[in-house]
């Protein structure tokens, strides 16, 4: 859901403000004289040339649809008239107006949210104010969706047995710490607004760290197989915005909060920010804005979610991720965090690590590929891929094995020239990040092979050949 911003007054100061915000949200500019209108239009800015004190000009700019309005002319009487008309035509927008020296009561009696003195605040400060206003409006929208859903549920309830929990918070399939922590945070926000909720997931809770997180923090999750969608009036999807990652088919989605960029779902409320490293950072920002202090368990979960999704702040990390982590630092339980990060390693995982080391085949001196055979715990594969990456001279690893009727592949790299997400997507329809990715493919015709040694050779050769082909390494170059 994009915020529509209208800037009225495109003088030197208005121009500076627009330069700070024009690449982030749809912008409409209104002024009597705009010399470079054609250039602005090419940059995606909507330009309205006219007198903003006139209703027809404001309506032409669709002022009624504006989320944020900035009134930035330097003429006091003009600003007052514009503010009056904007308050009338766009009552729900967040309004920021320029203060004029010697006119301290210029906007008295008008519903102006913020008055800015440009002698004290620069264009960058105004841009920051716009960002704050956008967040405030987003949270108002989120609250509205939740409250309306609760009201619908209350109308439907007839007896105690028919009582509905208004909100279902759904993570992506096989949820990771970021998804789980973000769901916990949304549940906390909803409770603050008087809305009960359940958290549900599909697939498996993988990795020893994830299981330790759930057990140590006492996180209550429901499996989608054990819920009835008809029992909920609001559906929120967390840490994914693509249908492929949903654990259950949903007729409608009310809320989507995510940080991935492969969006194909829509909802009444959407906050999708690909530039942010973790969804937990977005939810932490919500808590900060609403002055909600997280419990020790919630803070620990959110901190670990940010940490794990950004690979300890080394992968696709934004300013917000650092700010969120810094805020959470004083609330976390360090001893529990340490136990989550360092769970006991099972015997099977140790055996897979050993097989990966023993079976590794090194290509071009720094790419290690290892087939580990048939395993029951797919989560051992990324651990093995990480483990091989620590070996001297190795910069990229691919570890693969058979889990049930599928071949699972996990990859890691320190080589900035490679994008593992793209490589595994092209090779096997998988995905992930530049430095870490995964894929799975049906075992297919290989299921008919009963001899384990023959199966090993077939799978190892087929997977290795496809990976090297996509990377661009020819057989004779190995």
From Swiss-Prot:
Sequence ranges assigned to domain RCK N-terminal in this UniProt record: 2-120
InterPro entries, sorted: DDH_dom, DHH_sf, DHHA1_dom, NAD(P)-bd_dom_sf, Oligoribo/pAp-PDE_c-di-AMP_PDE, RCK_N
Domain of life: Archaea
Disulfide bonds: none
Gene Ontology molecular function: nucleic acid binding
Biological process, per Gene Ontology: potassium ion transport
Pfam families: DHH (PF01368), DHHA1 (PF02272), TrkA_N (PF02254)
PANTHER family given in the database record: BIFUNCTIONAL OLIGORIBONUCLEASE AND PAP PHOSPHATASE NRNA
Stated name of the protein: Uncharacterized protein MJ1633
């Amino acid at each position: 859901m994009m915020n529509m911003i209208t800037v009225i007054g495109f003088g030197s100061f208005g121009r500076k403000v627009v330069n700070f915000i024009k690449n982030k949200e749809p912008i409409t500019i209104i002024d009597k004289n705009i010399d470079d209108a054609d250039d602005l239009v090419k940059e995606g800015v909507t330009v309205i040339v006219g007198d903003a004190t006139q209703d027809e000009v404001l309506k032409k700019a669709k002022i009624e649809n504006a989320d944020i309005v900035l009134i930035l002319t330097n003429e006091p009487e003009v600003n007052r008239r514009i503010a009056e008309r904007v308050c009338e035509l766009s009552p729900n927008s967040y309004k920021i107006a320029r203060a004029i020296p010697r006119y301290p009561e210029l906007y008295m009696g008008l519903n102006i949210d913020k008055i800015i003195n440009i002698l004290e605040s620069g264009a960058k400060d105004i841009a920051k104010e716009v960002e704050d206003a956008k967040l405030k409006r987003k949270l108002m929208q989120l609250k509205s969706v939740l409250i309306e859903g609760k009201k619908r549920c209350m109308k439907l309830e007839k007896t105690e047995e028919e009582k509905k929990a208004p909100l279902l918070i759904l993570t992506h399939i096989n949820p990771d710490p970021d998804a789980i922590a973000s769901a916990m945070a949304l549940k906390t926000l909803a409770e603050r607004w008087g809305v009960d909720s359940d958290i549900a997931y599909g697939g498996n809770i993988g990795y020893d760290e994830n299981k330790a997180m759930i057990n140590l923090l006492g996180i209550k999750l429901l499996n989608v197989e054990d819920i009835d969608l008809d029992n909920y009036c609001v559906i929120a999807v967390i840490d994914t915005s693509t249908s492929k990652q949903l654990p259950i088919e949903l007729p409608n989605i009310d809320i989507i909060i995510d940080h991935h960029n492969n969006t194909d779902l829509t909802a009444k409320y959407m906050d999708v920010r690909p530039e942010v490293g973790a969804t937990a950072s977005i939810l932490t920002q919500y808590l900060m804005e609403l002055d909600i202090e997280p419990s020790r368990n919630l803070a620990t979960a959110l901190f670990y979610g940010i940490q794990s999704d950004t690979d300890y702040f080394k992968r696709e990390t934004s300013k917000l991720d650092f700010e969120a982590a810094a805020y959470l630092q004083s609330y976390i339980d360090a001893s529990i965090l340490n136990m989550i990060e360092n769970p006991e390693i099972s015997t099977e995982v140790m055996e897979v690590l050993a097989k990966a080391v023993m079976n590794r085949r090194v290509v071009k001196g720094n790419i290690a590929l290892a087939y580990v055979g048939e395993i029951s715990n797919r989560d051992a594969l990324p651990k093995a891929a990480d483990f091989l990456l620590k070996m001297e001279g190795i910069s990229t690893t691919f570890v693969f094995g058979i889990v049930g009727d599928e071949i699972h592949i996990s990859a890691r790299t320190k080589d900035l020239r490679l994008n593992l997400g793209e490589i595994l997507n092209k090779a096997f329809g998988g995905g992930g990040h530049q430095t870490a990715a995964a894929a799975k493919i049906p075992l297919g015709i290989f299921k008919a092979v009963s001899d384990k040694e023959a199966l090993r050779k077939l799978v190892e050769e087929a997977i290795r050949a496809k990976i090297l082909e996509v990377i661009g390494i020819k057989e004779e170059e190995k």
